[in-house]
Amino acid sequence: MRSSIHASRLRKMGQSIPASTGPMARSANRFLQNRAAIFGLVLLTPLLFAVLTYPLWLPYKPNDIDLMAMNSAPSWKHWFGTDGVGRDVFARTMEGGRISLLVAVSSVVLSTAIGFLIGAISALGGRWADAIAMRSVDLAMTLPPVIFLLVLASIIGSGIWSTVVVIALLSWPVLSRMIRARLLELREREFVMASRGMGAGLGHLLFRHGLPNSIDILVVYATLQVANAILLEAGLSFLGLGVPPPAASWGNMLNAARSTAVLEQFPWQWLFPGGALVLAVLAINFIGDGLRDAFDPRAELN
């Protein structure tokens, strides 16, 4: 009798205590409760779908020239109109999105890898490694960004992968400082000190302890940096130092439409690529802010 009463009490206690969830699950719940982040997803999802799948359902290619339809206004045939040589603006806007996102994502992957490695080596590699890494970060951060971009782009040259390298080399120092700050705290933990005592090498410390404990920083940085990279690519292409024509990118489409005649008489040639650029950057920033708030440790206290 007593055992049955005791068992029923245990069942009631188990029902009254909520099941604990891990930190990643709690972060995901906080992200899904962020209205701005969900709004960003709603904006970005159809844009990504259109950009990635447009060759399957659009009858026009981005570089198809139709001299009989030069500077045509938006219509059922050409949804976004045509440019000065009769190319479909919708097709070029979609292709420009593909190239701009390719440049942005590739540069973010490269800058994230560089930033993590330098920051982690600085924190876990010893005194000399820390001094050398931090002096390189200080040097990179003291260079004027615009001048550095222009000089580097003029040296490397224009092109998709040249633009990727230029943007990546400008973007990694901030991440290195964040990773270093996180791992300086981590290296004093008992499990890291135990690994050192057992003879673990730098590679083991970086990828067994450093990387898993830096995932939140890397995810938030990468998301927000994609938006910054899209803007940097657009700026370089607008100045003629990014993706070269006839390849389409949002930046060189705006560059091609910068004349007063086009701005005033054919506004669809800059309005649609400019609108897509703003929409993508806005949506990605909303998502990045939502991820930052979701991973914020202070949210655990609330």
Curated annotation (Swiss-Prot):
Principal cellular location given in the protein's record: membrane
Example of a GO biological process term: protein transport
UniProtKB keywords: Cell inner membrane, Cell membrane, Membrane, Peptide transport, Protein transport, Transmembrane, Transmembrane helix, Transport
Gene Ontology CC terms, in alphabetical order: plasma membrane
Segments for region (Disordered): 1-22
One family name in Pfam for this protein: OppC_N
InterPro entries cross-referenced by the UniProt entry: BP-dependent_transpt_permease, MetI-like, MetI-like_sf, OppC_N
Compartment annotation: Cell inner membrane
Domain ABC transmembrane type-1: from-to ranges: 97-288
Transmembrane regions listed in the UniProt entry: 38-58, 101-121, 147-167, 200-222, 230-250, 268-288
Topological type in the membrane: Multi-pass membrane protein
Origin superkingdom: Bacteria
Family according to the record: Belongs to the binding-protein-dependent transport system permease family.
Role description: Probably part of an ABC transporter complex that could be involved in peptide import. Probably responsible for the translocation of the substrate across the membrane.
Quaternary data: The complex is composed of two ATP-binding proteins (BRA0404 and BRA0405), two transmembrane proteins (BRA0407 and BRA0408) and a solute-binding protein (BRA0409).
Protein name: Putative peptide permease protein BRA0407/BS1330_II0404
